[in-house]
Amino acid sequence: MLLGAAVGDAMGWPYERRDRTRSLPPLSQVSGRFFAWQRMASSRFRPILEDIGPGEYSDDTQMLIAVARARLTAGDDWLTWLQRVEWPFLLDYERGAGASVKRACRAWEKHESAWGKRADDQEKYFSAGANGAAMRIAPHVIVHHEGSFGDLAADVIRDAVTTHGHPRALLGALVHAYALWISLRQPAPLAYGWLIEAALDGLKDWREPVWQSLDRHWLDAAAKALPGGYEQAWDDTVQEVEDLLTSARSSLDSGALSAPSAFLEEHGLTRTKTRGSGTLCAVAAIYLAARSAAGPERGIGIPARQEGADTDTLASMTASLLGAGLGQEWLGSFGRTVQDSALIIRLAENLLCPVSTTLVLPSRDEADQARSRFLEELDRADTRASLLLPDRRQARIVARGPMTSGNWTAQRTHLATADGQNLFLIRKVQRAEAESVHEVPRSEAAPTAGQRASRLPTEARLQGAYLPVTDISRVTEALTALGLSAPRRGSDWVSYENLVIRQAHTRERATGVPRVQLRVAIADVQVAWERLRGMAFDGAVQRDGGAFWVQIDPYLIVAVNNAEPPVG
């Protein structure tokens, strides 16, 4: 279920238009595998292009992992851990979080509630009806998989209100949780349309106003937030969801005459103002999963590439439902190559039987100090340095380098945690310093032939080496998996500092031994080997596991070692 959510997220993220910077490769070139792409990071006022590796996930999965970690780390105190540790820390590494989520995280960072005290803060909070709550609630479902839905619903609501206040967000989370919960209890295979019927049958359970048991401060704020009162808004939203589910059932009853894209477009899943609605996404995911149980691969491919949709979240929620009902074998190579797959599988297993040993909850001051200390150490640490994260995990710096995009520069740091999560932090975003430009004196403007000849030896500069490959997309995926980032790229080339890899003009495959060997030093050879083998490259381990080689292109072998100088 968690792995399916991550796969759907990673499949859909490149197709989300607000993050995409350029056209993507044709589907025929990337069918059946993840691919590298570029997104616009930072903000629209300070845009920075970021390279995204094959199978990397967005904030959807980051928050899902944060919720799972809070439950496993703090036990019964998971909610306080989420507010005090996870949400402030998310601001440092999030990849595409929505405005409502980031606004709430900043409030918890300042030890304030997400709903605030000022009227404008409360208006923004109780207007937040997006899918940011629904996308992350799967860990609660696993914890309560054998319990009552009432207990699950209470935890889902307590989690959801840490970032969102509108009934559409809360009911979206509850409906999605119910669909996951009931799917876990239904033996496979799932009948066509069964999940929609189950969701309608469960109306009496997920419609319950469990928000009425929340903190008094929240209830007081909610009572004044919406015209007609919160209870009326809740009932109206319940009716919206019931109508949507009924429409979804009618669409499925039409069978082959109904196209899933038509349903999504008709109900606002492709319109900018409504595509991120919590209730719309929850019902759309149920609809897509209900019609795709016999072909789950297609079930996540449709939302992942639906033009105009919130593709990463919709595909993630759909895939999590299919995972809950069908397991994870159908994910195939996607499940093996999605970012942090081993960690995600382990989190799901641990949530089934949580351990009784938990960490002591930090005080607010202790949590603040831990995060401040981490950021200070991060900024002055060298590559390969070890760091203690605010959530008390150990991590090491895998790579660090500058990012330049237009008039802006930044520094990106890639961290690998001891438990197997990869984090990418973009810091020090600032306007690039303009190069000094001055008018050249006339006496210097036209050097003589003799002057040019005498200056050549000192001014000559090696720009780099060009390497042709038969499949530049596949080669880029492999190098990204090794932690190498490309600061510049064109339509048929990618630049790794002084090495430029270029798509060969001919698509004929090379014969015999590859012409070039690229040597890469990396700290964790075993992890790199497993990652590349999971991508189906040929190769072999050498030096008792301290090195290996893989053929990533007919023209190119990559030799990887553990940072020791090669012999000979």
Regions found by a protein language model. Give the residues of each.
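Structured, active/binding-site neighborhoods that engage oxygen-rich ligands
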Residues: 1-455
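Short glycine/proline-centered loop/turn elements that form peptide/ligand docking sites
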Residues: 474, 490-494
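Short, ordered beta-strand-loop transition motifs
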Residues: 403-408, 487-491, 542-545
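Short, charged/polar, Gly/Pro-enriched secondary-structure boundary elements
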Residues: 500-504, 508-512, 555-559, 566-567
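N-terminal beta-strand motif that seeds the catalytic metal site of vicinal oxygen chelate
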Residues: 451-476, 516-518, 564-568
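Amphipathic alpha-helical segments
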Residues: 470-485, 528-534
